[in-house]
From Swiss-Prot:
Keyword Flavoprotein carried by entry: no
Gene: eif-3.E
Gene Ontology BP terms: formation of cytoplasmic translation initiation complex; translational initiation
Organism: Caenorhabditis briggsae
Chief localization: cytoplasm
InterPro entries, per database record: eIF3e, PCI_dom, WH_DNA-bd_sf
Top-level taxon of the source organism: Eukaryota
SMART domains in alphabetical order: PINT (SM00088)
Gene Ontology cellular component annotations, sorted alphabetically: eukaryotic 43S preinitiation complex; eukaryotic 48S preinitiation complex; eukaryotic translation initiation factor 3 complex; eukaryotic translation initiation factor 3 complex, eIF3e; nucleus
SUPFAM superfamilies per the UniProt record, alphabetical: Winged helix' DNA-binding domain
Protein name, per record: Eukaryotic translation initiation factor 3 subunit E
Subcellular location as annotated: Cytoplasm
Length: 311
């Protein structure tokens, strides 16, 4: 007969195996423990984190992703006593997610979906973990499938937070999309390379980031100036004019740079101007106000919790 004491022993044994470095056994034991107890069990959350940690250390990224999603579902069900505890757990979950998503195929797209597109998690970043904006920014810049649709929303968030948090990655996007300072953007890109090469999670995506960032600079430069000579680009790229023209053609075709055209007769790259409707402007400003209002609400909740603890 299987008793409650046996279940407790299974949890303690799992913890012991984990601390001994036997992550395979710990993972198996925690899998059974998680299925034997209900979510009201006091060790249920610990078991979820323990199973996730074991799979990360085993570098079993498929299993780790499944465990991350189970942990997220539990946290989103909000079994906590206060709203502040829920926000804190979401912040911790995003830190753990970095281990998984920066090693999982298409994981960077899932970072965008979780960190940027899910408002409760974006709120947690703004209030408790603005340093996660670096990892979100790198994910957006290097994502070929989501960059175009996500970049505008990311820049809005960075613009809101730039007075309270900045690093070379967010500063690069600030220079490019808010200040329109291309010289400073180039300087920040060099600093980004140094930062990424020393970042545990980002060092493997340095090449992708460098390439994508240069393309963003090229696209924005052409948009601002609307017209740029191929000869000037050739000098900057250290290419012949013919090589530069082929490079630009491949660039436009591969990355589908909106509105870009080459006038071979005049030797120019011409960028079409896209007008923004009044409706789009209203929607963008409304979204910005909503982000700010939610951030203020969470900061007030944090202040209330701090006051309760002080008393």
């Amino acid at each position: 007969m299987f008793t409650v004491d046996m279940v407790d022993t299974l949890f303690k044994y799992s913890k012991f195996m984990y601390e001994c470095g036997n992550y395979t056994v710990a993972s198996v034991c925690l899998y059974y423990y998680r299925n034997l107890v209900n979510q009201a069990d006091p060790n249920y959350l610990n078991a979820l984190y323990g199973k996730l940690a074991s799979e990360i250390l085993l570098q079993e990224w498929e299993h780790a992703r499944d465990d991350l999603l189970k942990l997220r579902a539990y946290i989103d069900a909000n079994p906590f006593d206060t709203e502040w505890e829920l926000v804190t757990q979401r912040a911790w979950l995003m830190h753990w997610a970095l281990f998984v998503y920066y090693n999982y195929p298409k994981g960077r797209d899932e970072i965008i979906e979780m960190f940027l597109n899910q408002q409760p998690y974006l709120n947690a970043i703004q209030v408790l973990a603005p340093h996660l904006l670096r990892y979100l920014a790198v994910a957006v810049v290097t994502s070929k499938s989501r960059q175009k649709n996500s970049l505008k929303d990311l820049v809005k968030v960075i613009d809101i937070e730039r007075h309270s948090y900045k690093d070379p990655v967010t500063d690069f996007l600030t220079c490019l999309y808010i200040k329109y300072d291309f010289d400073e953007a180039q300087e920040m890109l060099q600093k980004c390379e140094e930062v990424l090469s020393n970042d545990f999670f980002l060092t493997a995506v340095l090449g992708d980031f460098r390439e994508s960032a240069r393309l963003l600079i090229f696209e924005m430069f052409c948009r601002i100036h609307q017209c740029i000579t191929i000869e000037m680009l050739a000098r900057r790229l250290n290419m012949s004019q013919e090589e530069a023209e082929r490079w630009i053609v491949d660039l436009i075709r591969t990355y589908r740079i909106e509105g870009a055209k080459i006038d071979s007769k005049l030797g120019q790259v011409v960028m079409g101007v896209k007008s923004v409707s009044i409706h789009e402007q209203v929607m963008e400003n409304t979204k910005r106000l909503t982000l700010r209002a939610q951030q203020i609400a969470l900061q007030l909740e944090k202040g209330r919790q701090d006051k309760v603890k002080a008393n």
